[in-house]
Amino acid sequence: MAIAKEDILAAVEGMTVLELNELVKAFEEKFGVSAAAVAVAGPAGGGAAAAAEEKTEFTVVLAEAGANKVSVIKAVRELTGLGLKEAKDLVDGAPKPVKEGVDKAAAEEAKKKLEEAGAKVEVK
């Protein structure tokens, strides 16, 4: 006659901690196994762990000024606080980063403004 799993669980449930400890030792001796916790290997290299985490800092890159360069220059000045010449140089030198190390909301806001002005933008 085979013993059902439920019967075994009921028997274990009624045991004291000392009796459970003795049962574990008996299993270790009988089957040649160890009840020690298995060490789980960590991720290989730090790059894999960093890639799994959500990115918190973004860079808004002006890929291309588009047809309406004047509007893009105004948007760049508004976002960065640069002077006219500096903003024009940035737009003329595209692709260039407009904002670096900003959070996701600020990056999306900057991208939206620049795209509305006619620029092609990437968020990295």
From Swiss-Prot:
What does the entry give for GO biological process?
Answer: translation
Q: Which UniProt keywords apply?
A: Ribonucleoprotein, Ribosomal protein
| Matching SUPFAM superfamilies | ClpS-like, Ribosomal protein L7/12, oligomerisation (N-terminal) domain
Q: What CDD domains does the record tag this protein with?
A: Ribosomal_L7_L12 (cd00387)
GO MF term list: mRNA binding; structural constituent of ribosome
**Assembly behavior:** Homodimer. Part of the ribosomal stalk of the 50S ribosomal subunit. Forms a multimeric L10(L12)X complex, where L10 forms an elongated spine to which 2 to 4 L12 dimers bind in a sequential fashion. Binds GTP-bound translation factors.
**Protein name in the entry:** Large ribosomal subunit protein bL12
Query: Which family, according to the similarity comment?
Result: Belongs to the bacterial ribosomal protein bL12 family.
Q: What does this protein do?
A: Forms part of the ribosomal stalk which helps the ribosome interact with GTP-bound translation factors. Is thus essential for accurate translation.
Instruction: Give a GO cellular-component term.
Output: cytosolic large ribosomal subunit
- Highest rank taxon of the organism: Bacteria
